[in-house]
């Protein structure tokens, strides 16, 4: 009986007045979605780094583009936005092709070095995984930012996002280098365990 009395006398939680302004900022749903998006991007960076290690020239780039398209599709689903594969390819080409020194031409050139016996494959293995991972990371971050600002794939301007892409590309290089180092360390551990 005392428990019933205490429960009935407990103050009700204060409700916000109907005319009070809502607090701007992230909601629990948007914070959760942001975490899912960030983890999703990192998973696709890992896949892009792995795909770029394939020793077949140009197949590696095709695989990375396919991975990036799948990432864009999944981010579009996460944010409830429409997806178009042809527009996705166009945005990838516009963003990745526009970064001086690390554009699509650079990736193709690095991929083609795998044709050179011995040293060519090593050159490709050193630089392409970082380029592939950084590009994937930057593309993912561009789409997340654009979607969070209310945009969709149909109104994404690569020119307007180029500076942000370059900034995220630099962050992506660091992330991809870490992923590559972990994969190499795991490979060494596997070899050591086999002997």
From Swiss-Prot:
Primary residence: membrane
GO cellular component, one term: magnetosome membrane
UniProt region (Disordered), positions on chain: 1-31
Membrane topology field: Multi-pass membrane protein
Keyword Transmembrane helix: yes
Listed InterPro entries: DUF697
Segments crossing the lipid bilayer: 45-65, 90-110, 115-135
Localisation per UniProt entry: Magnetosome membrane
Residue stretches of biased makeup (Low complexity): 1-28
One Pfam family linked to the record: DUF697
Domain of life: Bacteria
Keywords: Biomineralization, Magnetosome, Membrane, Transmembrane, Transmembrane helix
Other comments on record: This bacteria makes up to 60 cubo-octahedral magnetosomes of about 45 nm in diameter which contain membrane-bound crystals of magnetite (Fe(3)O(4)).
Protein name (Swiss-Prot/TrEMBL): Magnetosome membrane protein 22
